[in-house]
A protein has these predicted regions:
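Residue-level recognition of well-ordered beta-strand positions that form the cores
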Residues: 6, 19, 81-85, 114-118, ...
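Short beta-strand micro-motifs in enzyme catalytic cores
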Residues: 78, 234, 322-326
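Switch/communication elements of ASCE P-loop NTPase nucleotide-binding domains
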Residues: 1-51, 295, 302, 309-461
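Short, acidic Gly/Pro/Ser/Thr-rich loop/turn segments
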Residues: 87-89, 241-245, 427
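Electropositive, glycine-dotted interaction segments
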Residues: 99-289, 293-297
């Protein structure tokens, strides 16, 4: 999981620092403080690695929307540093220790990726001015608080710099012998050092628009888990009107960020064809992991939490239009009917989309304002289910969530809260420093965290 970000020059994020804890990280604060900008950065990072700086910038609305505005101009450079730590699948990692590969020891990968993006009006594009990627193996998970102490003695340290003549230079500062496997065309020799040979290899492929992690991911299957950690998470802001739009039967399964794709996902689950069987699919589709495949029975049990009248769900392909028709069997007392998806309530469709996304996506990175359209009772149920689904199997994972709902906050823990404010045009995130006292007070009084947040009882760090 990504454990911390340091950002300067991205929208309202200036001299911005945020440490992420495993589990839920709930962003709260008034409108306009930059909560969505925080989530947008992670989406930007995902496209930056999966594609290139110009496309990532265009995806978020162009340079004018991404680079920080200063008076009547904008800051021409974005700098960022991202740290993370994730467990390795030792069976797939050739350069893991023999003890780890035999299952006797758990291995974790610690990484730091720092970069500077420059918008050049001369070339009308966004390019990397500088990048540095550092990576090492450890025998335990390292949090953001421990990083300054543990972020030393790297196994791999690569830096790429854009010179004044617009040519790229590469420097491999460190390359442990076992990491030679990262470079498939690496040929050892006595005439030069391993670091120099690695530099020659990287020079063939590094450009001003190539992210170092993207390069390593594509040339080394052993680094695919790095892609899952930095790119794989999905961001959701479900819009019921988008869920109701008819979908073609050829559309691939998977819930999109706006909720579209529900029909195709349910159709694939009905046909038991959700998981991709090609073992090389993840390798050639950087960062896009195969979807999980729960049973429809499991999904229906979750659907009934919001609407007990739902007895069954069916998906059929209209042979004339090739549109997918989703119908829900509704039973309420003596009343029985087959209701099409387009006639279901907005709240029910949002609940169904959120739960289907959580159960099928390889990872869920952020959810914006899940309380919209949901009954107050279901808001608390949603938090409980998110913990149950997202973190039961992935202990070292985190999910961001934005909310304005006191009801939803009443089901959250003080340690999960991040209070966001705007100071001098800059987004500032803080965690409450009186977590223990607040937890004791909640236990004694019976009031929830939302009550104390509204009352202003949270102390900032």
């Amino acid at each position: 999981m990504i454990t911390s970000v340091h950002i300067d020059g991205f929208k309202t994020l200036s001299e911005f620092r945020l440490n992420l804890n495993p589990g839920l990280n709930i962003l709260v604060g008034p409108n306009g403080t930059g909560k969505t900008n925080i989530i947008s950065f992670f989406e930007f990072l995902s496209h930056l690695i999966d594609r290139d700086p110009s496309e990532a910038t265009s995806h978020l609305g162009g340079a004018g929307a991404v680079f920080r505005r200063v008076k009547d101009s904008y800051q021409p450079k974005i700098t960022a540093r991202v740290t993370g730590c994730y467990p390795l699948d030792e069976g797939r990692v050739r350069f893991a220790s023999r003890k780890a590969r035999e299952g006797g020891e758990k291995t974790f990968a610690l990484y730091e990726y720092a970069f500077a993006l420059l918008f050049s009006p001369e070339f009308e594009s966004v390019v990397f001015a500088n990048q540095q990627f550092r990576y090492r193996h450890l025998n335990r998970f390292v949090s953001a608080q421990e990083f300054p102490e543990r972020g030393k003695d790297w196994d791999l340290d690569v830096e790429v710099t854009l010179e004044n003549d617009m040519n790229v230079t590469t420097k491999v500062r460190c390359l442990k012998g076992a990491f030679v496997d990262l470079f498939p065309f690496f040929h050892g020799g006595k005439s030069s050092k391993p670091t120099e040979q690695a530099e020659e290899f990287l020079k063939r492929f590094c450009t001003s628009s190539t992210a170092i992690p993207s390069l390593l991911i594509r040339f080394s299957p052993a680094m695919l888990l790095l892609s899952d950690d930095m790119v794989g998470g999905q961001t959701y802001n479900i819009i019921p009107s988008r869920v109701k739009v008819l979908e073609d039967s050829a559309k691939p399964p998977g819930i999109a960020s706006d909720g579209s794709g529900l029909s195709s996902t349910l159709y694939a689950l009905r046909r038991q064809s959700l998981r991709r069987e090609d073992p090389f699919w993840g390798f050639y589709s950087s960062g896009r992991a195969a979807l999980k495949r729960p049973s429809l029975e499991v999904l229906k049990n979750y659907f009934q939490l919001a609407n007990k009248a739902i007895q069954d769900v069916d998906v059929a392909n209209d042979p004339f239009s090739n549109h997918l028709r989703v119908t829900f069997k509704i039973q309420n007392g003596d009343y029985v009917a087959d209701v099409p998806l387009s006639l279901m309530s907005d709240g029910t469709l949002k609940w169904i989309s959120l739960l289907t996304a959580a159960l099928t996506a390889s990872s869920v990175f952020s959810i914006e304002e899940p309380e919209n359209y949901l009954h107050p009772q279901m808001q608390g149920e949603f938090v409980r289910i998110m913990r149950e689904i997202l973190f039961s199997e992935r202990q070292h994972a985190c999910t961001l969530m934005t909310t304005h709902s006191e009801t939803l906050l009443n089901h959250c823990k003080p340690s999960e809260l991040v209070v966001v404010s705007l100071r001098d045009g800059k987004t500032v995130p803080v965690r409450c420093s009186n977590e223990a006292d607040l937890s004791d007070e909640i236990a004694k009084s019976g009031f929830g965290l939302g009550y104390y947040y509204i009352a202003g009882a949270l102390q900032d760090e």
